[in-house]
Amino acid sequence: MERTLTILKPDCVKKQLIGAVINQIERAGFRVVAMKKTRLTKETAGEFYAVHRERPFYGELVDFMSSGPCVPMILEKANAVADFRTLIGATDPAEAAEGTVRKLYADSKGENIVHGSDSAENAAVEAGFFFAAEEVVRSN
């Protein structure tokens, strides 16, 4: 089994879509093995997205991710990273495939409901940013 990290972003929480998005995730065969509701500070959001520090959208991303509560989750499934990225759709909801999370719920490229790790290696690092080992449910 492979794991990936997702974050239901502040726009998802504000629009009261947590349940709808988790339902879509579980219906796609993912198992939630860790989940919490938290609020990132500008500092922690900046640390999490440090890889984008030199990109023009970095400041807006940090501001947005620290603007309200978010829900990080570790998901488990065979081929989790690729399958999850397919489920959520393109970063820009206008370019996302029909039926994807972002096509259904996102308003813009900047406020796009959900983060998904882009590789198994990054998923492991990102999961460790939010969760201690004892917070993760063991696989059966």
UniProtKB/Swiss-Prot annotation:
PROSITE patterns (UniProt xref): NDPK_LIKE (PS51374)
Disulphide-bridged cysteine pairs: none
Residues annotated as binding ATP: 9, 57, 85, 91, 102, 112
UniProt GO MF annotations: ATP binding; metal ion binding; nucleoside diphosphate kinase activity
Active site: 115 (pros-phosphohistidine intermediate)
One GO biological process term: GTP biosynthetic process
Catalyzed reaction equations: a 2'-deoxyribonucleoside 5'-diphosphate + ATP = a 2'-deoxyribonucleoside 5'-triphosphate + ADP; a ribonucleoside 5'-diphosphate + ATP = a ribonucleoside 5'-triphosphate + ADP
Cellular compartments annotated: Cytoplasm
Alphabetical list of InterPro entries matching this protein: NDK-like_dom, NDK-like_dom_sf, Nucleoside_diP_kinase
Enzyme class, first EC level, given as a word: transferase
Cross-referenced CDD domains: NDPk_I
Entries under Pfam families matching the protein: NDK
Obligatory cofactor(s): Mg(2+)
Predominant localisation class: cytoplasm
This enzyme's EC code(s): 2.7.4.6
Gene Ontology cellular component terms for the protein in this record: cytoplasm
Keywords: ATP-binding, Cytoplasm, Kinase, Magnesium, Metal-binding, Nucleotide metabolism, Nucleotide-binding, Phosphoprotein, Transferase
Subunit text: Homotetramer.
Cross-referenced NCBIfam families: PRK00668.1, PRK14541.1
Chain's role: Major role in the synthesis of nucleoside triphosphates other than ATP. The ATP gamma phosphate is transferred to the NDP beta phosphate via a ping-pong mechanism, using a phosphorylated active-site intermediate.
Recorded family membership: Belongs to the NDK family.
Protein name in the entry: Nucleoside diphosphate kinase
